[in-house]
Amino acid sequence: MKCEIEEFIAYLHNTKGTSKNTEVSYERDLRKMEQFLGNEGVDRVQNVTATNLNSFEMYLEREKFAASTISRSIASMRAFFQYCCQQGLLLENPADILKAPKIEKKMPGILTVEEVDLLLNQPKENTAKGVRDKAMLELLYATGIRVSELIGLKLENINLKL
């Protein structure tokens, strides 16, 4: 199963153009599944059953993994076994029967005006790094973009003619 997982991660990267974070998460999830199944005596993709995957899901629940982690693991397994079906390794996807747990959505915490002021005044503006950090914090605060979006910005994304 190790080779199939490696090929799947390469497929995600080369064909689907997934982010590095997605690839790392999927690989971690699938390696955890592979280890669990190996302990159960299942070491080939062709031998994996829906019952095996259901047992793995119950194991994750017993180990007190968060609902969001279990949900992502199920998504990883579904995608992996769908890939195996497309490659002709399986006739049907054993992960299709898995149901993701309900994820409780928590509202993000809100900073007070004082906390925002304190945060925005942290960078020392007498250095280039401080000016950069201040600009990044101001952009995050003013627009609400995610940190991953901020990090992904390129110079050509910025309108310098304002």
Which role does the model predict for each range below?
Residues 1-162:
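Conserved catalytic core of the tyrosine transesterase superfamily
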